[in-house]
Amino acid sequence: MKHVIITGTSRGIGLEMVKLFAKAGNKVLALSRNTEPVEGLKLKNVHTISCDITQEDSLEKVVEYIKSEWKHVDVLINNAGAILNKPFLKSSVEEFKNIYNTNVFGVVNIIQKTLPLMPATGHVVNISSMGGVQGSVKFAGLSAYSSSKGALITLTELLAEEYKENGHSFNVLALGAVQTEMLEEAFPGYKPPMLAIEMAEYIVDFSLNGQKYYNGKLLQVANSTP
């Protein structure tokens, strides 16, 4: 049984991961600003906290819960994300900041809070996008989103290097097109071949076993692009 934190659990891949981890008997801490979807499942061993990862005081509730109930964290999956599909010259600096606050600084925030509570075998899995991979197909209008996901990839590589003597593992998955509400927002009407549950199954397995084979690695998880 592992102690697993997942961010961005109100819908899509995050919600499916909560179900899968719980079904396998793991303890799950589901973090999202909207906790109702997870609470409605009434799953054993799943605890929800209404949390905004961009706010440090919001994460203090997470730290307090871990210290009082779990004592440690085995797996952290940074799945929460924000997207903006808007032409570059029409995107304000404030809009760029909002995307980076969730996709980069929010991830930094929660890793800094939870890493001291991880054993040497702990695994941090960051969820990026194929749009953030150098040399991959890019789409106009996603300059804020894709560049933030590129930053997340580099951050993961740097953390793996910095903590390689401690035993902690950091990996990043660049996801391709998946049938989620978030993709529908960016590409209205497009129906990718992969379902959220299918991608969730892959991420769950990787988060539990991937650190045996990878550290500081970018894995491209995609069989198509929009």
What are these regions (language model features)?
Residues 51-61, 93:
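The beta1-alpha1 cofactor-binding region of Rossmann-like NAD(H)/NADP(H)-dependent oxidoreductases
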Residues 87-88, 95-97:
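Substrate-binding pocket helix/loop in short-chain dehydrogenase/reductase
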Residues 165, 172-173, 188-226:
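C-terminal helical subdomain
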Residues 125-151, 156-157, 161-164:
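Catalytic loop of short-chain dehydrogenase/reductase
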Residues 10, 18:
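N-terminal Rossmann NAD(P)H-binding glycine-rich loop of SDR-like oxidoreductase domains
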Residues 24-39:
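Conserved glycine-rich Rossmann-like NAD(P)H-binding loop of the short-chain dehydrogenase/reductase
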Residues 79-85:
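Conserved NAD(P)H cofactor-binding loop of Rossmann-fold oxidoreductase domains
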